[in-house]
Amino acid sequence: MKIAYVVSSKKKCGPNIVILNIVKELANKHEMEIFFLDESDDDVFECVNVKSTQIKKASDLKEHLKRFDIIHSSGIRPDALVVLCKVIYRVKCKIITTIHNYVFQDLYYSYGLVKSLIWGLLWCSIWLFFDKLVILSKNADNYYWFLPSAKKNIIYNGIDDNDCLQNKKCNYRKEFNIPDDGILAGSCANLTKCKGIDLVIQTLTKEHKIYYIVAGDGIEKHNLINLVKARKLHERVYFIDFLDEPESFMSQLDVFLMPSRSEGFGLTVLESTKLGIPVITSNIPIFMELFDQMCLTFDIKNPSTLIDVITYAKKNRLHLSQKFHAIFQDRFTSSKMATKYENVYNNLFREVL
C-alpha cells in the first residue's frame, strides 16, 4: 500500500506522536510519505526514514496525493485540505482521519462559546466526507453520536514500549531545592484551561510537603503564575518551559498529575506509566474508561481529595508502578495500535481495488 500522512506541522504534539508511532511500526511494510503545512523549530519525524514534503497550497497537495492509496490526516486544516482534494479535485483514494479531541469542549476552553460552535460545526461537517473516522475511546464514540457509525473505528492510542530514557539534563530536586522528604509531583501540558492545572494549585498549601512542577507553555501560563503568586505558593509550585524530551523530567517525579477537565486521550499518562511513575488523573469519563485500573483518580468536583491521593501514591509507589506498567504493556503499546490502524487501511485498500 501507498500511504500518505497530512499534518499541520512536524512539531512534537500528541497527534503527531500517534502518527510517528504508526509510521515506526508499519514503514517497513508499506510505502509512506509525510506532508506538512507549516515549518516548525522541531521535527518529531526526524527519527524515521520516511520522506516529508511541505505543502503550501491545495493544488500542490492534489498532485502529490494522486500517487497514494490511503490518505490519513490529522487536524482541522489538514482534514479540510484532504477533503478538498477528494471532493473538488476528485483524487481517487480513500481518506481517513483520527479525531483526537472532544471538539466543542476543546475549542470552548481555548476560544469561547461562539467560536467553539462555529469552528466545531465546520470541523464536524468536514469529517462527514471521510471514508473512515478513528475515534480514541467508547466515550468519544458516544460523544460523536451524530457521525455515521459505519465510518467510525475505535482505536486506543499507544506508544513505543522500548526503553528510551535519556541521561538527566537537570536534577529538578536540586534545581528547586526540594527536600528529600518532599513529594515531587509534576505535569506536562499545553497550558489551557481544559488541562486543569489551576485545580492543583488551588488545592496545595504551604503546609503540605508537596512540590509541583509544571512543564509547558500556553495561553493560561500567565494566569497560572498569577494564581501561584496570589496563593503565595512560589516555594511550592514551579514552572519550566515546554520539554522536547520530557522523559528525564517525568522519571524524577514521585507522581505524575493529569487533572484535565477535558481530554481526547492523554499520551503523557502512558509515557509516565512506561517510566514507572504512578499517575493520578481527574475522574472525567474518558480517563475512567481508558485508565480505570492503571491510574489513581481524584474527584474533579472536589479537588481537595487530591492531597490524600498524592500521599497514597507516594507511599505505595513501587506496588502501583509495577501494577500500572503491566496494564500499559497489555493495552497501550504502539505495536497494538499500529496493527489496528493497518487493519483499517487494508479494509479501505480492498475498496480501492
From Swiss-Prot:
It is an enzyme of class 2 (transferase). Disruption phenotype: Loss of LPS O-antigen production. The gene is wclY. InterPro entries: Glyco_trans_1 (IPR001296), Glyco_trans_4-like_N (IPR028098). The lineage of its organism: Bacteria, Pseudomonadati, Pseudomonadota, Gammaproteobacteria, Enterobacterales. This is O-antigen biosynthesis glycosyltransferase WclY. The chain crosses the membrane at residues 116-136. GO terms for cellular component: Gram-negative-bacterium-type cell wall; membrane. Keywords: Glycosyltransferase, Lipopolysaccharide biosynthesis, Membrane, Transferase, Transmembrane, Transmembrane helix. Pathway: Bacterial outer membrane biogenesis; LPS O-antigen biosynthesis. It comes from Escherichia coli. The keyword Transmembrane applies.
